[in-house]
């Protein structure tokens, strides 16, 4: 009788649960259809992103080529800068030489005038030989010709150096233009890196969605909602990272750090480091030189003292120690140096 009373109740419960199960089944079917639609949309978006990736890879290759070319050009510019520095030093030397030659020319002109005056005086006072005067004039003319030729050659060299300076100035302007291009390339590279990170995240979430789709139908809806929520949060985080980096100052102000300006900062820091290293080397070289000089002087004085004690006044220590030290200190010194003393020196010290 008890079994007969329980069977109708179980049937009623089963009948009540059937519509609930149908409702859950309908919900699951709708969720699965939504998932399929989302996956189709993701596939289309991924195809578009793949096309963009291919285009960006091509642009990256072209940018790498441009970077290699810019590096080569930078090396060539460094060599040109070195050459220009050498030429500038040569220019300075030439300017100094030209100044000296001009002074010599003035001195020669003055001396020629003085010689002419002296010749005129001597010609008035004493009848000089015409041949001697002709020789003097010929020598002076030869000297003047040599000085004029040297001045002309120096002027030609100055013209050449000025043309080289103009070419170097143009190269420096080109170098600044290429540096600006390099900064723009770096900015584009950073943007492309950010896009690649976004694409990787999309592929990762796509694989996670596919793995969630293969699970049993009972937990599919909750997993789908969790994945969508996580994906939205991740997109928000990545969107924040794509914005320009902002650094908070002490006065709570924001300073935008541009990625292209890092190149100039690195160049300046490298130049400062090299200058500091050179200064340190010069500092240690000078002190090492002073140290060697002091050591040489010390050994020289020590040699003089030993020579004096050996050949001039060997009894200096014997006469000076009793005057400087007391008897107790002399006995202590004798005890300390006893193993190293000979019989002659031992007899000199007090007992």
Swiss-Prot record:
Coiled coil: 17-214
Disulfide bonds: none
Keywords, sorted A to Z: Coiled coil, Membrane, Transmembrane, Transmembrane helix
One Pfam family from the record: TMCO5
Superkingdom, natural source: Eukaryota
Keyword Transmembrane tagged: yes
GO CC terms: membrane
Segments passing through the bilayer: 292-312
Bilayer topology: Single-pass membrane protein
Annotated localization: Membrane
The keyword Transmembrane helix is assigned to this record: yes
Entry's family note: Belongs to the TMCO5 family.
Official protein name in the record: Transmembrane and coiled-coil domain-containing protein 5B
Record organism: Bos taurus
């Amino acid at each position: 009788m008890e079994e007969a009373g329980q069977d109708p109740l179980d049937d009623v419960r089963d009948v009540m649960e059937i519509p609930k199960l149908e409702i859950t089944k309908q919900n699951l079917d709708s969720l699965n259809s939504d998932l399929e639609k989302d996956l189709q949309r993701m596939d289309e978006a991924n195809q578009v992103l793949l096309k963009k990736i291919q285009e960006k890879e091509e642009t990256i290759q072209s940018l790498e080529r441009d970077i290699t070319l810019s590096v080569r050009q930078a090396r060539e510019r460094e060599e040109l800068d070195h050459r220009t520095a050498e030429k500038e030093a040569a220019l300075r030397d030439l300017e100094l030489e030209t100044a000296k030659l001009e002074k010599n020319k003035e001195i020669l002109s003055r001396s020629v005038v003085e010689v002419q005056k002296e010749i005129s005086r001597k010609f008035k006072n004493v009848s000089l030989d015409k041949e001697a005067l002709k020789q003097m004039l010929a020598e002076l003319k030869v000297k003047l010709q040599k000085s004029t030729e040297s001045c002309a050659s120096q002027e030609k060299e100055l013209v050449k150096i000025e043309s080289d300076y103009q070419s170097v100035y143009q190269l420096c302007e080109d170098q600044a233009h290429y540096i600006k291009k390099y900064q723009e390339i770096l900015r584009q590279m950073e943007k492309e890196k950010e896009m690649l990170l976004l694409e990787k995240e999309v592929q990762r979430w796509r694989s996670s969605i596919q793995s969630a789709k293969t699970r049993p139908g009972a937990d599919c809806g909750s997993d789908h909602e969790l994945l969508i929520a996580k994906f939205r949060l991740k997109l928000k985080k990545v969107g924040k990272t794509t914005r320009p980096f902002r650094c908070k100052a002490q006065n709570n102000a924001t300073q935008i750090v541009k990625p292209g300006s890092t190149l100039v900062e690195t160049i300046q820091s490298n130049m400062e480091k090299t200058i500091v290293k050179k200064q340190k080397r010069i500092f240690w070289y000078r002190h090492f030189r002073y140290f060697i000089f002091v050591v040489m002087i010390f050994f020289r004085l020590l040699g003089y003292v030993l020579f004096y004690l050996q050949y001039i006044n060997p009894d200096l220590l014997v006469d000076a120690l009793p005057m400087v030290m007391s008897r107790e200190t002399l006995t202590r010194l004798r005890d300390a140096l006893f193993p190293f003393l000979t019989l002659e020196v031992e007899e000199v010290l007090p007992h």
